[in-house]
Amino acid sequence: MQIGNFNTDKKVFVIAELSANHAGSLEMALQSIKAAKEAGADAIKIQTYTPDSMTLNSNKEDFIIKGGLWDKRKLYELYESAKTPYEWHSQIFETAQNEGILCFSSPFAKEDLEFLKRFDPIAYKIASFEANDENFVRLIAKEKKPTIVSTGITTEEELFKICEIFKEEKNPDLIFLKCTSAYPTAIEDMNLKGIVSLKEKFNVEVGLSDHSFGFLAPVMAVALGARVIEKHFMLDKNIESEDSKFSLDFDEFKAMVDAVRQAESALGDGKLDLDEKALKNRVFARSLYASKDIKKGEMFSEENVKSVRPSFGLHPKFYQELLGKKATKDIEFGDALKQGDFT
């Protein structure tokens, strides 16, 4: 799939998710874009919302988080603290362009999408918590841009509906990311085999949005067919933000990108034909040799013929055919047996 100038058929698309790791500082956001590029990310992703496009400013129990990393926090207050302000977007997109890194965002409501459209992003992402909103999904599909959907809390029925909407809107560029909506995610809760299931069941491009510690999961995901990897990125571990607990710093992210590139390189093309290196090593395969001196007219037997390394003699498949045949010439111990040596 083509996302901007990037082709996911050729390389795994690595996304640095900035999210709240700007810690309320535009300067930190801009520095993070430059650092993400240096760390090897193909794209920087931000989030486009206001607390009012996310939730209601209510103190009722429904709007208070229970458990987890943000226990007892009010939803409105959380989103007010974590947002990437609208007024930053122009500088963020401009900086990304200047640094040569792709930039796109997750809008969370119609007004966010309308605002984001002025920057003509290369793609959109739909968070799993918004993926059940069919009207919003259709608005995104109508944009005819590559769209990434996190599947975290989304049901199979909802995922089928998303596919149906994109088909109706004639937008074929859909990517599902396996995602576990726990922050952070325990490695045993990842269910990475779901990547394979998403590909087989929905026939879409697949990847991983990862909230676990470290980067074991992204590397494994590549081996399972992921063509997109999204991971939260932060400048350094001293940053205090809503997402810092499950984010990679510069050194960790760079190490992850290196590991992902090694993993995709190790996968190869899947063909079973021997490559040039393997063909060279065929010299050490077994073949038939004289294990004793053999006189002309003497019969070949288990006593004077052996299948050994290297491979300059007859293929071992001729062993049974050779037994009982007569030597056409004197053969010395250690000679490779050839087609004309028996009759």
Language model features with spans:
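Catalytic cores and adjacent flexible loops of soluble metabolic enzymes
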Residues: 1-343
